[in-house]
């Protein structure tokens, strides 16, 4: 589902900073992945690229067989809404909703009926135990 091949990212400025150097990664549908590393090692940059929030300089990124490069904002938002989810180390839940409602919220925006989204949210919460 997610395929990265030889991904490079450099932040240009007074001193160029080459933060991703030849990253290769494959993530299957439904697979849970943890990205860990020291401060400044490129984790946030990698997540921004995976989440289609930032572009890469070199390499190939495909999501469900579609090349992720130069997408319109509308198409990128559609991919993020339907295909990508993150759980951050320090995350913020919507305080007036319980855990199940927080997990189900993206499904609401996708138009999934309430019973189905609640069942899916509970299923995924059970996987976290």
At which residue positions do the language-model features occur?
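ABC ATPase NBD coupling module
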Residues: 17, 68-85
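Short coil-to-helix segment of the ABC ATPase nucleotide-binding domain corresponding to the Q-loop/switch region
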Residues: 97-106
